[in-house]
Amino acid sequence: MHLIRRGDPHLAVRSSEGLTTVELYGELDLVLVQRVRPELDVLAREAGALTVDLRHVTFCDASGLGLLVRCAQRVRSRGAAWRLLCDHPMTLRLIRLADLDDVLRPSPPSTAAPPAPRHDVPGHQRI
């Protein structure tokens, strides 16, 4: 599996044998959603199984949830596997309060491979 930088320090993509993992970084708010939506739309249409990793996301608002729902629905509509990795208590609470557990199906990190070390993400800047 290799890490592909997509020109945005808030997004990293890994692909291997039909599985694509998207790691998001920072605050998943309207500003970030507008920046990463085009890339996620392409991946939701074209990638095999898609995992979105929110373990480096520090905040998520309604626009972030909307992006995730859109992505999950597009992936599943083509019969591909969808997975959302999330361990942030407030994001998990937001998903529950919005009644999106069945749509997004968040998985705890303990059931997934660990995230890439920060030094593996060239050009990543903390915000």
Write out the residue ranges for each language-model feature.
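STAS-like cytosolic regulatory interaction modules
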Residues: 1-60, 70-127
